[in-house]
Amino acid sequence: MASNRILYVCQEVAPYVPDTEGALLCRKLSQAMQERGNEIRTFMPRYGCINERRHQLHEVIRLSGMNLIIDDNDHQLIIKVASIPSARVQIYFIDNDDYFARKAILRDADESYFEDNDERAIFFARGVLETVKKLRWTPTVVHCHDWFSGIVPIYLKKGLRRRPDLQKRSRSSFRSTATVS
């Protein structure tokens, strides 16, 4: 059986953020698919609550340094990487001080959503796709987990017109643990 190239675009991955259903799922799914011989790349935002020293994150200079324009402003894209030792799974982190330096993930101390969560999600999605492009790596399957990654399939569909290698091969799926009220 030929292995797939699977891209996981995750809002959270355990153990880097508190154990939520989504964070645990992304970790276990990435690990299980890699153990079955698939080639995977897993991405998540580098939130300010992630201890870079404890988790041994380091910047990947050759992938960092590009600027992404969000709402008419330039924002530097920084790529960091770490491995989950017990799983031998590598995680790529999309980082930017304007969007991800704060200690909370999606809500402030009053439990209100950050006003710029939409911009943060756009930056994350574009950062993932630009990094995959820089890696010269073409996924056959794209898994998007939670709403922070929800725009990735739209970007993929729009970008497929310019990337014939992805047109016939790439399939995407979306999973959300959010409740709608």
What are these model-derived regions, one by one?
Residues 1-181:
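Catalytic cores of nucleotide-sugar-dependent glycosyltransferases that transfer UDP/GDP/TDP-activated
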